[in-house]
């Protein structure tokens, strides 16, 4: 039987791996041991203890957060119950009794306004919408002839308008939507003074920020369509030191206020901004008869300065006497 002898040049395999590998591992272990053996400072020890305590209290913090949420929920519920009388209008609306009265903003003057005034009209419409939503007796709100620059501006700057509730936004003219006998156009050039509001009627406010460029336009439009027209009884109750200009939203809010109170004077003085310097007309009469003679015959719901009082074509010409100042109702700045 023959035996084989390994050549002298062949060495047994190194079962411990490559040379130097074990040395490297030993060095790393030694470094870790040395690091653990090094004493830590009081600050580090305090930090470690704080971290450990934080981890131990994790569940307790969860429970505290749950309790806090429950407590806040209960507080909100109690607050709502305590405000059940309607004082908190943001959370609880007062008793709402919708009115049948239709209030229309006529937007058919789009091509007569520059973009700056279109934006102002848009803001005034936003205010009207917000006030109607909060009102005790909200009206049936219409925007008619909606399109052109106004619609484009609303699309670009107020995309939420498409989700507005309790409003009728129509591209058609108001005369196509409502019977002629039900329409009443509000304009300061009308010789008719409004004494009361008829909830079966539809009152039209001209949506035009004009700066006195188109005098008498709304009155002419009402006459051409053969519809009724009237002015609010502003001069009977109010004397203003400033220019007698009411924004679209002012006219809208005055009507909302009158529906709630049934009192024109209260409606005017609740809505008119302080900067107008408004005082009751009877007091102005007592203090200055001359000022009383200068009181205008009304206001203009559509544009600034429809028919000056000296205009030959003004329907106020026969009534004006010593009146010389014109009145308008749409301010270029929304309130």
Curated annotation (Swiss-Prot):
Signal peptide: none annotated. Residues 63-75 have a biased composition (Basic residues). Residues 88-279 form the SAM-dependent MTase TRM10-type domain. Residues 1-91, 279-335 are annotated as: Disordered. Keywords: Coiled coil, Methyltransferase, Nucleus, Phosphoprotein, S-adenosyl-L-methionine, Transferase. InterPro entries: MT_TRM10-typ, MT_TRM10-typ_sf, TRM10/TRM10A, tRNA_m1G_MeTrfase_euk, tRNA_MeTrfase_TRMD/TRM10. S-adenosyl-L-methionine-dependent guanine N(1)-methyltransferase that catalyzes the formation of N(1)-methylguanine at position 9 (m1G9) in tRNAs. Probably not able to catalyze formation of N(1)-methyladenine at position 9 (m1A9) in tRNAs. This is tRNA methyltransferase 10 homolog A. It comes from Rattus norvegicus (Rat).
